């Protein structure tokens, strides 16, 4: 049995190493994972209570339309319920957008490096994927991306803040780009890390939906809300666009646990505020030490920092791993001397910085 020709070259997604695997492989008892941009403070206590309340309903199918959560999200963001589509993580919404709109005759554009699932899902549909390198500061080169738009372009993907670089586009930049692309081009604004941003120039993208019908905004409960293992995220767009995405959505694609926990997490504003402030403090803590070490880094607007360690990134990754610190280095990013580290708690950040200084003394500068 032969698979589709256009998937033969596709890589299998490689997540950050799990803690249990590192403990087992290296015989360690104390391991800190700063590889997958998870919330170091977990999730809202209210979300935990919501999960426990459903334990006796495991045998019951979830609400296929996630009605309660849909209405809560609609109220939270000031949109209509028919503008919202849920997925098992926002990455499933990416999959559904590609499935609903891309054909082998289409082209689709993103920055490079960025979240790999845009390319992955576009190529499954046979579309031509065009990657435009970020600039020297790790930001989307919107002018160069716009130059690639033509009559075959169907979707432009913009990750903001961008993963893995952590950089941010302002509302002025986003609006200018949207107004420059033809109406037949969908602009997907992936804002998985939006709740972490404290920069006043960060776009209020959801309000832009009132003016632009060709944009879709993606959000997730996996990051600041701390529900990564439950897999739930959503897209907000024009009702006609959302209707098309819904047509390719699998039934019961989000669990009762995810829906109920998401509802509780959405309403715990104090938890989100605390996490946002702690993350901002963590960025200051880490970057202050990086400045002392003379290590460059991109501006961080999410909950992670991309650092130029001035040494082979894989060697630094391995050195940190031996000390029980899991970070991320991906040769596919095109940055051989850079690592990406999640901002942890104050103690986790301190242990990372101590380990990093030790590793830097052992690995030769490139």
Identify the function of each model-found stretch:
Residues 1-60:
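N-terminal "arm"/small-domain region of PLP-dependent enzymes with the aminotransferase-like
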Residues 30, 80-84, 104-107, 152, ...:
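Short acidic capping loops at alpha-helix termini that bridge into adjacent secondary structure
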Residues 59-107, 125:
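Phosphate-binding glycine-rich loop
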Residues 65, 214-298:
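PLP-dependent aminotransferase class I/II
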Residues 100-158:
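PLP-dependent aminotransferase-like
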Residues 123, 140-151, 164-187, 191-222:
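Active-site pre-lysine segment of PLP-dependent enzymes
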Residues 280, 289-323:
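Conserved PLP-binding catalytic core of the aspartate aminotransferase-like
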Residues 319-323, 328, 332-366:
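PLP-dependent enzyme catalytic core of the Aspartate aminotransferase-like
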């Amino acid at each position: 049995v032969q698979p589709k020709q256009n998937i033969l070259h596709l890589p299998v997604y490689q997540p950050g190493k799990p803690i249990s695997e590192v403990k087992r492989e290296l015989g360690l008892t104390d391991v800190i994972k700063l590889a997958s941009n998870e919330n170091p403070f977990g999730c809202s206590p209210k979300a935990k209570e919501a999960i426990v309340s459903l334990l006796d309903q495991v045998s019951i199918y979830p609400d296929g339309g996630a009605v309660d959560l849909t209405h809560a999200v609609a109220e939270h963001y000031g949109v209509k319920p028919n503008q919202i589509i849920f997925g098992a993580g926002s990455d499933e919404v990416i999959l559904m957008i590609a499935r609903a709109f891309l054909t082998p005759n289409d082209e689709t554009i993103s920055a490079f490096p960025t979240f790999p699932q845009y390319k992955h899902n576009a190529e499954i549909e046979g579309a031509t994927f065009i990657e435009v390198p970020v600039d020297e500061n790790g930001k989307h080169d919107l002018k160069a991306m716009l130059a690639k738009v033509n009559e075959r372009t169907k979707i432009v993907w913009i990750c903001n803040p961008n993963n893995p670089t952590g950089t941010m586009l302002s509302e002025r930049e986003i609006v200018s780009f949207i107004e420059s692309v033809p109406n037949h081009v969908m602009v997907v604004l992936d804002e998985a890390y939006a709740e972490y941003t404290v920069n006043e120039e960060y776009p209020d993208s959801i309000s832009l939906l009132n003016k632009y019908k060709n944009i879709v905004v993606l959000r997730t409960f996996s990051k600041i809300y701390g529900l990564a293992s439950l897999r739930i995220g959503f897209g907000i767009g024009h009702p006609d666009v959302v209707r098309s995405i819904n047509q390719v959505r699998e039934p019961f694609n989000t669990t009762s646990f995810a829906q109920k926990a998401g509802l509780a997490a959405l309403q715990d504003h104090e938890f989100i505020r605390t996490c946002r402030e702690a993350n901002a403090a963590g960025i200051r803590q880490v970057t202050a030490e990086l400045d002392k070490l003379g290590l460059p880094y991109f501006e961080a607007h999410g909950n992670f920092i991309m650092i130029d360690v001035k040494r082979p990134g894989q060697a630094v990754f391995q050195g940190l791993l031996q000390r029980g610190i899991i970070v991320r280095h991906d040769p596919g990013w095109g940055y051989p001397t850079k690592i990406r580290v999640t901002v942890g708690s104050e103690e986790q950040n301190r242990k990372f910085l101590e380990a990093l200084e030790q590793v830097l003394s052992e690995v030769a500068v490139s």
